[in-house]
Amino acid sequence: MQRLWLSAALAAAPLGCTSDPPPECIDVSTSCAPFYQPTFDNLYTMTLKATCGSADAACHSAVGRSGGMSFADEASAYAALTAGRVKPGDPSCSKVVVRTSSLGASYQMPPGDPLREGERCALIQWVQAGAPAPSGAAGGSP
């Protein structure tokens, strides 16, 4: 009876979780070439809003709010990222960097077409610089 139960458990094991969870940290290079100056203003305008937060992208639009994040406006995007998804000064262990840099993984963000290398670089360098707030925001860095 025990062998039958064990066989059934082993056979069902692969049916549980079909995707691995993202790692806590990955290796990233901060000596890459960003497409633009790695400020949050640029990151939001040139990558996040257009790629993840537009009505066409839907995932992190005002309506989509996937993962509880809206990139519909700069303040919401900054608040969402700095509420545990970014470790200022530590891009290797920042959830947003892990997910955007894990090309081909089930947890890659955005799903489908990844961010371009220069966009990922700008994100990595912004986090490395301490994830400073947008230029018009009060309160400075997180």
Task: For the regions a language model picked out, list residue spans one by one.
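Aromatic- and Gly/Pro-enriched helix-to-coil junctions and flexible linker segments
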Residues: 17-142
